């Protein structure tokens, strides 16, 4: 349920022009000093994830792993991608909160 809300919020952020979709645009956003958060799909390749995490660490930006695959993200946003940069502080904070709530729910379900 919370993941559907996250995908909906991503859709709103995309329509508002606050997302950089794809590896290269996300890396460019980090290099340009845009304070953001990076969301990655759970099926992103290890090599791509390593590169994104390295760049994010240098820019002091959080990387959050979503529970969705690239195909699921693509269905929600209209573009299949595994790396999303959220370039708006308000959207980024809300997505951080939603991702942490989802992680807490999953931990409770496992126990």
What are these regions (language model features)?
Residues 42, 67-68, 88:
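Short secondary-structure boundary segments
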Residues 11, 31, 57, 78, ...:
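Signal for well-folded cores of large energy- and translation-related assemblies
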Residues 31-53, 60-62:
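N-terminal positively charged helical leader segments and presequences
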Residues 71-110:
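C-terminal structural segments of small proteins and small subunits
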Residues 39, 110-111:
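Ribosome-associated RNA-binding proteins
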Residues 6, 22, 26, 34, ...:
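Amphipathic alpha-helical interface surfaces
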Residues 2-40:
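N-terminal first-folded block
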Residues 54-81:
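Mid-chain, well-packed structural core segment of small domains
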